[in-house]
Amino acid sequence: LLNMPIVDFLNKRVLFVTGKGGVGKSTVAIALGIRAAMEGRRTIIVEVASTENASRMFRQEEVGFKEVEISNDLWSISIDPEDSMREYVLLQLKVKAMRDLLFRSKMFTYLAAATPGLNELVTIGKIWELAQLDRKIKHGRKYDLVIVDAPATGHGISFLQTPRTFANIARVGPIHTQALQLQEMITDKEHTGTVLVSLPEEMPVNESASLEAELT
């Protein structure tokens, strides 16, 4: 449900697009990306599901965990939690020997499996990194707008609440600090927006209304 003029959405830094499965959520996310690119805004569409829609719509090969230009001023990336975790470790651990040991042991894979919500947290962390004007990765491109094709409403609520959950669990330390950063991004009404996609049917509308209530 777009309850404000589209130009207001395109002036945000981050847009989360969600809705009940099957209502055209991914199509709306891509359409917003195309419109933003036509307005001259350097835009990246972020997909968090295993199925890529943006590259397929533009008849290109799957992009994977790479920022690939699929049209003028329009990029796409598919975020894989394991790749996000690996990138996070590379940014946090400065000692190469420690990084190599961690990757060889696959410890971070076991950690993700044993920590509910960690995959979602590192995924949102990558979204945050993409939205920074001062990118953390080498040669990171600066984007005007990051459009996230977020999970459907059932998972979408818990997905967007993940940083707050981790900030409450980890009361101190880097996890707490970084989770607060992510939560601030999600709740920043000036720079972040949420687009709720629905159909004129009772169940999709009710789910969208519930999600809106959860987010406010």
Each model region followed by its residue ranges:
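The Walker A (P-loop) glycine that initiates the GxxxxGKT/S ATP-binding motif of P-loop NTPases
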Residues: 19
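N-terminal phosphate/diphosphate-binding loop that engages ATP/GTP or pyrophosphate donors
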Residues: 35-104
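Flexible beta-alpha connector loops of hexameric P-loop NTPases
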Residues: 82-83, 110-119, 166-174
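ATP-hydrolysis module of ASCE/P-loop NTPase motor domains
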Residues: 90-131
